[in-house]
Design a protein with these regions (language model features):
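Core catalytic lobe of class I
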Residues: 1-178, 185
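C-terminal segments of enzyme domains that contribute to small-molecule binding surfaces
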Residues: 188
């Protein structure tokens, strides 16, 4: 979830989308767990017509920090999940010590591959496959069901299929259907 900046009543300010989502999820019974910050390498500040650097350029005090991170919010419904000793799905889903040490840190610097997107695909909030792959391996086991309420181009669906997870996805924009079918067909 990316925060945003807005001009509200003539005053430039931060609109903390992540805080609003946390507040709402806690209100409906979810428990907040430590979040991850994904440092997006594609939103580096630039200047003089070469990008998105805004504010007063090189003059204080009206420049502002570029929002180049997104929050990966993690919630749980109820208490910790329990498994029987030696549960086969849990052992089949294990990760290595190196993966654990890399994944269970608060700041992720994940770089995606260059994408050549159609006009429809550019409207999606695209992210590298590595993001849902890590999250599914960290917080689910083989055979679990993953829910993506904003399916978009189907990245999460594709990764879930590759990892042996079941998947439910919702998307209100019908133009994405063809893209999702193409992505999932290539994965089968």
């Amino acid at each position: 979830i990316g925060d945003a900046t807005r001009n509200i009543n003539g005053i430039f300010r931060l609109f903390p989308n992540h805080a609003k989502v946390v507040e709402h999820c806690e209100k409906i019974g979810f428990v907040s767990l430590p979040y991850i910050l994904w440092k997006k390498p594609t939103t580096k500040p630039k200047y003089k017509g070469k990008g998105a650097f805004l504010g007063s350029g090189m003059l204080p005090p009206n420049a502002y920090v570029t929002l180049d991170c997104e929050f990966i919010l993690i919630f749980r419904k109820g208490g910790p999940r329990r498994f029987t000793p030696k549960d086969p799905a849990r052992y089949e889903s294990r990760y290595t010590k190196q993966e654990r040490d890399k994944w269970f840190t608060q700041i992720w610097d994940v770089i995606g591959t260059k994408q050549f997107l159609s006009e429809v695909e550019r409207r999606a909030a695209a992210f590298p496959e590595e993001i849902p792959r890590r999250l599914m391996r960290m917080f689910s086991v083989v055979g679990d069901t993953v829910l993506d309420p904003f399916l978009g181009t189907g990245t999460t669906l594709k990764v879930a299929m590759e990892l042996g997870r079941n998947m439910i996805g919702y998307e209100i924009d019908k133009e994405f259907k063809r893209i999702v079918e193409r992505e999932t067909h290539a994965t089968k």
